[in-house]
Amino acid sequence: IGWAYIDQEKFCKPLYDLVDLRTRMVKRTILTTIEVLVGPIRAKNKTHLLTGYVHAAYPPVYSNLAKVAGFDTAVLVKGVEGGVSPALRGDGKVFYYSGNNELQETKFDPKSISIEQNMRAVPLPNLDKQEGVKLDEISSDINVEDFSAKTSEIGIEALNGKDGPAKDTLIYTGALTLSIIKNISFNEAASQIKKAINSGKAKDFFYNSIWIIIK
């Protein structure tokens, strides 16, 4: 088992070449929806899709596209800002299908796996604003490289077992995904995720996979 990343420029250059046009258009295009289903890396046996959505109309669209694209399972999470992690407060809504089954809806309660946070998500890093880094009127005036470095630091701390919203997000997202794909209880899935993090196994796996990819 491992993980990998292939840059769009490498696996679909014509699509990547539209980046400048899409930036100038600003608005979300249909390409933003369908490009997550390309899946340049496929498993030998089963391939699962995990993606996020915001608007209620998206789950059936993603589900139908995922089946056409050949995904054995699709897990569609109503995530914070369209990401794959649900809000840490309140029930997490998830749509999913497995095999030839129809799309189903379910909810996960973070409190049932001992996650009780007052915030919806991991707070953004507190960085000083800088002059000259804004690209336009809607972009941030935070240095992107500094932001990325601080975000990575928060993620590594979570993998090191530091309690807080980042670790809770890993547990919550991992547990709901594992419970659906492996068809086990939410609590059992959370227990496995917590054990992997607290034992250091998750961090070792993360670093070993990076080393293999770089090599």
Stretches found by the model and what they are:
Residues G2-K215:
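Glycine-rich anion-binding loops and their surrounding alpha/beta cores
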